[in-house]
Curated annotation (Swiss-Prot):
Lineage, broadest ranks: Archaea, Methanobacteriati, Methanobacteriota, Stenosarchaea group, Halobacteria
Keywords, in A-Z order: ATP-binding, Kinase, Nucleotide-binding, Ribosome biogenesis, rRNA processing, Transferase
Record-given protein name: Putative adenylate kinase
Region (NMP): 28-51
Originating organism: Halobacterium salinarum (strain ATCC 700922 / JCM 11081 / NRC-1) (Halobacterium halobium)
Residues involved in ATP binding: 10, 12-15, 99
Record family assignment: Belongs to the adenylate kinase family. AK6 subfamily.
Gene Ontology biological process terms in this record: ribosomal small subunit biogenesis; rRNA processing
Functional summary from the UniProt entry: Broad-specificity nucleoside monophosphate (NMP) kinase that catalyzes the reversible transfer of the terminal phosphate group between nucleoside triphosphates and monophosphates. Also has ATPase activity. Involved in the late maturation steps of the 30S ribosomal particles, specifically 16S rRNA maturation. While NMP activity is not required for ribosome maturation, ATPase activity is. Associates transiently with small ribosomal subunit protein uS11. ATP hydrolysis breaks the interaction with uS11.
Amino acid sequence: MRVAVTGTPGTGKTTATGRLDTALDVAHLNDLVGTEGLYDGVDADRGSKIVDVDAVRDHFAGREDVLVESHLAHRLDDLDAVVVLRCAPETLATRLQDRGDSPEKAAENADSEALAIILSEAVRGHGADAVYEIDTTDRSPDAVAAAIQAVLDGDREPSAGTVDYTDYV
């Protein structure tokens, strides 16, 4: 099984996937990008690596039994399931600023969340029948992990389009 856990930065991907009890190899893409050199350069304005998506796809090509966690994980090929973590934009902006992001970066990510950018990309790339949307706003990390586990165990139906934050914009 090839699974992506994706979502706007700050939705809880790393925390939740760290609590899963799964036989899948859990890969934290943000770590791999640096250690494996899967980037083209650095964005001087944001201070972040510019991910080479083709290199990432090549890195995971042919690998089965893997769960990839990242805000870019939905861009991988041949995924069996894409779990998109969502969070209320106001809560997301607070989380991001609490962890040290600038107000501008937090606002940019909150706007992306309100517009469902990652969800839209996931559905466009993999179809609604492969996408599972989970709202993390009022859930504990353990509850989010349990919801992801339900997807892995086949106990949850696809749910793309069930969370709506467009009133934020």
